[in-house]
């Protein structure tokens, strides 16, 4: 099993020592300072996959690792190393393989992956929105038969759709130029994820601080590039503190949202103590209503045992999307009760039981399935990288 986060020594010295990757176009790589005797000894004791590598060496190893069919292997290698180094992460096999495993699972190392039947998916979205406004499909088709900025009609472009980037661009054009486009979609582009790691556009826009590349048009557009998709995907995997026993849970969080695995474990503990069955989905409060959800109601039923008011419970649960939740009295008191009742320490991380839903998904898949698949790929990558010098 892989550790959940890179080991560290002095934070500032470690950044200077390990983060030596530079952006494409730089003439040369800076020489990192030599480690102290103590740091060198500590590094030597780490598992090989956790030991830092020189950025230039890692790039050449990534090029040799990537499958034959991958286009522009040096570009991939540079983007991965840049993503790690500019986010203060150690350039080592474990971190590189975590990023590559997600990229392989999500898009098989394609910067702009082809989605089968995307034109039909787009029409379904358009017609569904039109139906809500009582607009007949033939009226929509007629409206979209006009020429778009590319010279082709919107309808023809939709029929020929192959990638989410193309789909996003069409909706941008429609919203900006077609009166009905504004009526159907307002200013909200319905394409929410994309790129080589299928990152949420909303996530990228909320976590753009420190992005090392020039933003040509918008963060949305950057998500659909290889460099942007990899940078924001890396941010999604490692960009938050989480005391997980294994990276498996970070992979689950990549799919279900930050701290979903921690929150699912809390829900399991609440269910044990309260005796009330709960869906282990990682959602501690309802985001669609001010009314308490099932998790909050279950905690209410043990309010006297955790010695907290309903208001205090609610305020604690609102911290469920941050690291601070694990510092709350509610978190510690619930787990104290659960550990005591079980006679042993209960897991602080559990794979969320979430059904994956998307027009692109045609099988019965779950977050746990996704996390385990990525974890298998990461471990296979680490084993292969160990043979590449």
Task: Label every PLM stretch briefly.
Residues 2-3, 9, 25-389:
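Cell-wall glycan-active module
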């Amino acid at each position: 099993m892989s550790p959940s986060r890179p080991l560290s020594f002095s934070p500032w010295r470690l950044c200077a020592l390990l983060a030596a990757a530079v952006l494409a176009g730089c003439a040369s790589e800076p020489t990192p300072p030599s480690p102290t005797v103590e740091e060198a000894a500590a590094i030597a004791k780490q598992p090989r996959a956790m030991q830092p590598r020189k950025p230039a060496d890692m790039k050449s190893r990534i090029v040799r690792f990537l499958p034959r069919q991958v286009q522009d292997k040096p570009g991939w290698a540079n983007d991965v190393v840049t993503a790690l180094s500019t986010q203060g992460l150690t350039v080592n096999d474990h971190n590189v393989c975590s990023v590559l495993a997600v990229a392989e699972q999500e898009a098989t190392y394609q910067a702009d992956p082809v989605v089968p039947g995307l034109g039909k998916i787009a029409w379904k979205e358009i017609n569904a929105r039109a139906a809500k406004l009582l607009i007949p499909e033939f009226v929509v088709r007629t409206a979209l038969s006009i020429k778009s900025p590319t010279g082709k009609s919107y309808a023809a472009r939709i029929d020929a759709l192959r990638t989410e980037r193309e789909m996003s661009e069409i909706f941008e054009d429609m919203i900006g130029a077609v009166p009905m486009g504004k009526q159907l979609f307002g200013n909200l582009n319905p394409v929410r994820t994309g790129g080589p790691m299928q990152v949420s556009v909303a996530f990228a826009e909320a976590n753009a601080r420190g992005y090392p590349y020039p933003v040509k048009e918008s963060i949305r557009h950057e998500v659909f590039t290889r460099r942007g998709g990899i940078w924001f995907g890396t941010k999604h995997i490692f960009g938050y503190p989480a005391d997980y026993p294994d990276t498996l849970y970070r992979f689950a969080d990549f799919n279900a949202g930050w701290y979903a695995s921690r929150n699912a474990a809390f829900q399991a503990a609440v269910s044990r103590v309260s005796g009330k069955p709960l869906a282990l989905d990682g959602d501690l409060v309802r985001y669609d209503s001010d009314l308490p959800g099932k998790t909050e109601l279950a905690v209410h039923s043990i309010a006297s045992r955790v010695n907290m008011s309903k208001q205090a419970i609610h305020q604690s649960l609102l911290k469920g999307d941050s690291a601070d939740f694990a510092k709350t009295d509610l978190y510690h008191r619930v787990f104290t009760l659960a550990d005591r009742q079980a006679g042993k320490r209960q897991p602080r991380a559990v794979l969320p039981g979430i059904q994956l839903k998307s027009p692109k998904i045609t099988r019965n898949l779950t977050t746990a399935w996704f996390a385990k698949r990525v974890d298998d790929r990461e471990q296979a990558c680490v084993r292969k990288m160990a043979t590449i010098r």
